Design a protein with these regions (language model features):
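Short alpha-helical transmembrane segments in multi-pass integral membrane proteins
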Residues: 1-37, 94-161, 207-262, 320-385, ...
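Transmembrane helical elements of multi-pass membrane transporters/channels
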Residues: 35-54, 155, 189, 222-226, ...
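Hydrophobic/aromatic residues within transmembrane alpha-helices of membrane transport systems
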Residues: 42, 54-58, 69, 94-99, ...
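Helix-terminus/linker motif at the lipid-water interface of multi-pass membrane proteins
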Residues: 45, 49-67, 136-143, 201-210, ...
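Small-residue hotspots at the loop-to-helix junctions and early N-terminal turns
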Residues: 63-74, 149, 153, 216, ...
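Hydrophobic transmembrane alpha-helices of multi-pass small-molecule transporters
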Residues: 78-81, 193-198, 227-231, 304-307, ...
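Short runs within selected transmembrane alpha-helices of multi-pass transporters and secretion channels
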Residues: 87, 156-174, 182-190, 215-230, ...
Length: 467
């Protein structure tokens, strides 16, 4: 019996990684979650490794370099917000069309999403490249940090298009049920970046490398390769999504529908990432460069464990979209509740790791005693609310996948801007908590978001949304 289950388990893993497109409107729900979640978890896990490897190599360049990466990543989350918002809209629309068996409209929707993304990417790139100094100054960077890091910031903003397309096209493939192809594109991007990082930063055989700018260039090259792989498979036409040149003719009905879903989804993450920018600034103002460095190391580790959990959340989004398209509402809800259970279990294990192993985790990235102290403190406090975070992220993504992107936006606004930021400011400035106050505001807000999102999801408004 045990041997049979082991064989079945590895057979499912092989099937999940093969890259076949599945009809998730029928069959065992646990199997459907597994087939979708495994490649999504592996996809985002390697993205997490990529973020940590980046911080490991950059960390050897000193406090200023760590701070620059932290400041820039905080600002780049605005681009991530746009990318994830467009990706969320694409996943919801394409999953619904696939559930309805309308693959031609699914392909046209994918092409329209690519056009919309191109316009926004150009605008973000121009703004970031021109105003890199001012953006770093706004984040609270010192004169020395700005001088050392402005080129890094320019390069990262200049590559906005590859960031947006990498996320968007993966959302398209996930909506079509091909999570494995999305995984492979991010693997390509991450592996190339990991190989190029030390070469471009430190050099080789007498070449001194590009230092901090080398880290940015390695990231751009890696992501560019991932996008090239995605585009190849989109135009190859062997799967559900078969994009033709005629699909790029503007279809204003689809564009309107896409934007109606994308702008709330984008603002969800703008609201969330904007609050993180304010929190980053608050930490810098309260504790200086050492506090910023410790906090950024902690956040990179938080991201390392949160991104795999997003794999389960994204699986819920695809399942709810396809099953609503097939008019199987009960199956859609059961899929979400099962994914929520699995995510809560996973995040409870992560919480234990952060509480008991934070010291060796942070020490791996730096030898600075003060940076380690602050990083450990941040990891332990922020990690204490991870069970609720796991529940909340599935609820929010499920509503997004159903096409109800406005409700999670309102929840995010209340949780982050009416609770987290005011609470963090009060605790750091007036309560005597100091830096700890900024850290405690995070799990408190995330717990509130999870409770509210769960309650609203169970009310069932998402069942009536048309996309």
């Amino acid at each position: 019996m045990v041997a049979t289950n082991i064989v079945k388990f590895f057979s499912l893993i092989k099937e999940a990684l093969r890259g076949d497109e599945h009809d998730y409107t029928q069959g065992n729900i646990r199997t459907a979650i597994f087939l979708l979640a495994i490649p999504m978890i592996l996809e985002l896990s390697l993205e997490s490794v990529f973020a940590l490897v980046d911080m490991f190599f950059v960390g050897k360049l000193g406090q200023n370099a760590i701070a620059v990466v932290g400041y820039t990543e905080s600002m780049i989350t605005i681009i991530y917000s746009l990318a994830i918002g467009l990706s969320t809209a694409a996943t919801a629309i394409i999953a619904r069309r696939v559930g309805e068996k309308d693959t031609e409209d699914a392909s046209t929707s994918a092409a329209q999403a690519l056009m919309i993304s191109g316009v926004f990417s150009v605008v973000l790139s121009v703004v970031g490249v021109i105003y890199s100094d001012e953006l770093l100054r706004f984040m609270g960077a010192s004169v020395d940090v700005i001088a050392e890091g402005k080129s890094f910031t320019r390069i990262m903003f200049g590559s906005s298009a590859v960031i947006v397309y990498l996320f968007l096209i993966n959302g398209i493939f996930r909506g079509a049920g091909n999570a494995a192809l999305a995984m492979k594109s991010l693997w390509i991007a991450s592996i190339i970046n990991i190989i190029l990082d030390p070469l471009f930063i430190y050099g080789l055989y007498g070449w001194e490398g590009w230092g901090l700018e080398g880290a940015a260039i390695a990231t751009c090259v890696g992501r560019g390769a991932g996008v090239a792989y995605q585009v190849f498979h989109m135009v190859k036409g062997s799967g559900i999504i078969k994009i033709k040149l005629s699909d790029f003719t503007p279809d204003w009905k689809i564009i309107k529908s896409m934007l109606q879903l994308a702008w709330p989804a984008t603002f969800q993450f703008v609201i969330a990432s904007g609050s993180w920018i304010v929190l980053t600034r608050l930490v810098a103002d309260t504790g200086g460069t050492a506090a910023s460095a410790g906090y950024q190391i902690a956040i990179r580790n938080v991201v390392f464990f949160i991104l795999p959990a997003w794999g389960l959340s994204n699986a819920a989004a695809t399942l709810i979209g396809q099953n609503l398209g097939a008019n199987q509402v009960d199956r859609a809800e059961k899929s979400v509740m099962l994914a929520t259970k699995y995510n809560a279990i996973f995040m409870s294990m992560v919480m234990a790791i952060f509480i008991f192993l934070s010291q060796p985790i942070v020490s791996f990235f730096t030898n600075d005693a003060e940076v380690i102290r602050i990083g450990v403190q941040a990891l332990q406090i922020i990690g204490s609310g991870f069970i609720f975070y796991g529940i909340g992220m599935v609820m929010m993504q499920a509503m997004n996948g159903a096409g109800d992107t406005k409700t999670p936006t309102v929840i995010n606004f209340v949780g982050f801007w009416l609770v987290q930021i005011p609470l963090a400011y009060f605790l750091t400035q007036y309560s005597g908590f100091g830096l700890e106050g900024a850290f405690w505001a995070v799990p408190i807000a995330e717990t509130l978001i999870a409770v509210v999102a769960y309650y609203i999801f169970k009310q069932g408004r998402w069942k009536t949304i048309k996309v």
